[in-house]
Amino acid sequence: MLPLTHNEYFTTSGHGASWKVHLKPCTQVPKSFYEECIRAAQILYESASSPLILLFSGGLDSEYMVNIFKDAGIDFKVAIISYGDYNTHDTIYAYNYCEANGIVPIIIDIDIEHFIISGKIIEIANAAKCCAYQIPSIMYGISKIDGTVIMANGEPYVKNFDGDWRWEETERVNSYMNWFTSQGIDGTPDFLRYTPEITLSFLKDPRVVQLVNNKLSGKLSTRTSKHMIYSRDFELAQRPKFTGWEQIEKTSLMNNEAFSVINDLKKQYNGVFELSWTKICQHISIES
């Protein structure tokens, strides 16, 4: 089994108010974000014991990841999780990319109505200690993939708290790690943070440095700036940030008791961990 992050540099402990992230420093001086992503792809390829399956949602993060593996010259397959007509507004970007690049994706079909009504969504949320209702269906899809599963679960996120820029991690998003571990899924949910060098290279990217020095008026986080960072290396179309649940949320399915049950999990599993940008950079910089 692959470690969820390289050399287990990123681990967590506790739950809720006691939830914490523990980090190990870089083992070499980071190069650019792009170069470190290429290196991480090579590490995963060399370490994997089964074919690499890249989970492609249609979002910027997963498209950047797929491009990285292409540039690295690594063999891989692509998997797309489908909720039928409910998430085509999101997956259309993945389908279009695959068509343009001659990729035949693996389609993981999920009957989202049955997934909710049957209570499967609650079962998985409890097993993964996940308090975000949009996530268990993705976890369910991952469990159906045969191979080494690679996800791109967001960039190293930095947020502006009244002028104080902080690196932030949430327990609900990191519940993917619980699912991979509990189900014995090989791979990583966090390709864009797989090594400490990726994390530090992103945090010290010139665009992020401008952000944290308040040189970009009106910007509140790295969410919008990452398109600019990713687009230095690849041509990526602008798109909204989707969860894939936007159409489902307009239906009566949301009246199902499952959602109140999952919401109650926030009392236990909704931890947040923050470090100032300065501290996180110091903490994971290579030891002298």
Positions of predicted regions on the chain:
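Nucleotide-activated chemistry modules centered on ATP-dependent adenylation/adenylyltransferase
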Residues: 1-52, 68, 74, 78-84, ...
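Class I SAM-dependent methyltransferase core
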Residues: 53-57
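Catalytic nucleophile loop
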Residues: 61-62
